[in-house]
Amino acid sequence: MSGSASECFTGGMQSIGRARVFGQTSMGQALPALFDRLPNGDVLIHAYGDFVTADGTRLEGRGVIPDQIVPFRREDLLAGRDRTMEAALGWIDEFRRTKKTP
């Protein structure tokens, strides 16, 4: 699961056609925030902007939706298997064979 700056980068690259995204939808927590210390020592965290991709998609509350959804399974984790990596490598192999996006 990813969020914040990783969503901004991934969503931005996906929106301009420079990345294919595999896995699960990200957290949808992509607002840049500031941390202000209050007089009593507490810290107030507040958003000061929004992130919108090149195609106009707002990531906050939505997340980056993968081009290829790969379910996350506990048994794969316990077995040391990474189905997301397998899917990405399979796509790369297909691209190399055909020289076009599968």
Kindly give the residue locations of the regions a language model identified:
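Conserved functional hotspot residues or short segments at active or partner-binding sites
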Residues: 91-102
